[in-house]
Design a protein with these regions (language model features):
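Tryptophan (W) side chains
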Residues: 24-26
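Iron-sulfur-associated redox domains of electron-transfer enzymes in respiratory
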Residues: 30-285, 290-293, 324
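Ferredoxin-type iron-sulfur electron-transfer modules in oxidoreductases and energy-metabolism complexes
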Residues: 277-298, 316-408
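Extended amphipathic alpha-helical segments enriched in small hydrophobics
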Residues: 297-307
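A donor-sugar binding/catalytic signature common to diverse glycosyltransferases
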Residues: 305-312, 316-321
Length: 408
């Protein structure tokens, strides 16, 4: 892939240049230098554990799945021993339950409440901090903090598509986010193909899974049977190739290749949900006055859980804070949601004063105007907005109702 030309523009030129360099490196990783069939290798569970060790030795902070507070969440891990061995989960709308699988699978779950969004688009980002001094103030901190290199362990295909979408949001165009660019600058991704579908997943409908096809350095398929516990590995980048060379790997046997393909095929056949996307943009644009909006508004709490759990939602706001003595002030950027009244507040009131208008705005943007804005849907089919909605609202059911119910 050819390196893109850097356009010299006014404003934050340094940030724009850095962001475009990050995006070029990431897109380069999406194009393996050899066919996947030639890059297919197998490593044992012990060698997988060694892979995590060498990433730590190289200075990466490992972030991966672990069990905490009754859920499989993303957090800093020290190695394979922190992974959710033997755990899976049951998910339905408004319901999540951690379950024991009865085996030693490390990645035997679908997706938890956390996406990888927070790793790059942090929930809170300090912009500057100052202290009062001699009738004026002194800036204590300003600008983007240096970030350690990050290794994502166990990223699923839907979430890799979500990261690619957020790259478009934060790294392309004139408004480049410097904090996001700094976090994305050095990232190593160990993807895992899904071995089971969650009860609310519909990645097949969205074309985003269950097999990882982009944005990874290494993609693993976990196999656990009478021939042992092992991982079939696809290499997606030169850093990935180098890492595998350091731990050693064996050529994948035809039996393991077939077993790995069967794992992904079985997952695709057992999706918990489906959402046909044919004509979905036109459907949403034509449904502004659909009676279904009143129905969903009667159930929606406007709590913003769906937008917080969503791996692509990117609304934020800026706050100024002071300490109780008024001596120290800071400005921070934090996550916001289009479901809050303040999000659309302008002089004279809120543009979206009702829950009806806020839900309609969210769904229309996610599935329609997002396509016009960024060239892709804003939904990757992870199902988190269904699982973590306390009112048990199901986005796939709402879209189906818009298709079937009569318009006013």
């Amino acid at each position: 892939m050819a390196r893109p030309q850097i356009v010299r523009e006014c404003g934050s030129r340094a940030f724009a240049l850095l962001a475009r360099e990050v995006l070029w490196l990431w897109l380069r990783r999406m194009s393996p230098t050899a066919p996947l069939q030639e890059l297919c290798l197998t490593i044992s569970r012990d060698r997988f554990a060694r892979l995590l060790e060498i990433l730590r030795e190289d200075g990466y902070r490992l972030v991966g799945p672990t069990v905490r507070d009754g859920a499989i969440v993303h957090d800093t891990i020290s190695g394979a021993g922190d992974l959710p061995e033997g755990f899976g989960e049951s998910q339905e709308r408004g319901t999540y339950r951690l379950e024991s699988r009865g085996d030693r699978a490390l990645f035997g779950y679908a997706v938890g409440p956390h996406s990888w969004k927070a790793s790059f688009f942090a929930p809170t980002v300090p912009l500057w901090r100052a202290r009062r001094k001699d009738g004026s103030f002194v800036v204590l901190e300003q600008g983007v903090r240096e970030q350690p290199p990050l290794a994502l362990i166990g990223a699923r295909s839907c979430d890799l598509h979500a990261i690619a979408i957020q790259d478009r949001v934060f790294l392309e165009g004139d408004a480049v986010d410097p904090a996001y660019a700094a976090r994305r600058r050095r990232t190593f991704v160990v993807a895992v193909n899904c071995g089971r579908a969650g009860g609310t997943c519909f990645c097949v409908s969205m074309g985003t899974g269950p097999r990882a096809t982009l944005g990874f350095d290494l993609a693993l398929t976990e196999l656990l049977d009478d021939r042992g516990h092992r991982f079939v590995v696809e290499i997606g980048s030169e850093p990935g190739r180098d890492a595998i060379a350091r731990i050693g790997a064996e050529e994948t046997t035809p039996e393991d290749r077939e077993a790995a393909d069967a794992v992904v095929a079985r997952t695709a056949e057992h999706m918990g949900r489906q959402m046909p996307t044919d004509g979905i943009k036109e459907l949403l644009y034509a449904s502004v006055d659909h009676p279904r909006w009143d129905d969903v508004a009667a159930r929606c709490l406007a709590c913003a859980n769906c937008t917080l759990a969503c791996p692509t939602c990117f609304c934020s706001t800026v706050e100024d804070r002071t300490d109780l003595a008024g001596e120290v002030a800071e400005r921070v950027q934090r996550w916001d949601s289009c479901f809050t009244m303040e999000h659309s507040h302008v002089h004279g009131g809120s543009v979206h004063a009702s829950i009806k208008s806020r839900y309609r705005q969210w769904l229309t943007h996610k599935l329609a105007s997002w396509i016009d804005q960024f060239g892709t849907s804003g939904c990757v089919g992870c199902g988190r907005c269904i699982t973590w909605c306390p009112a048990a609202i199901d986005i796939t059911e709402e879209v189906a109702a818009l298709r079937e119910a009569p318009r006013r």
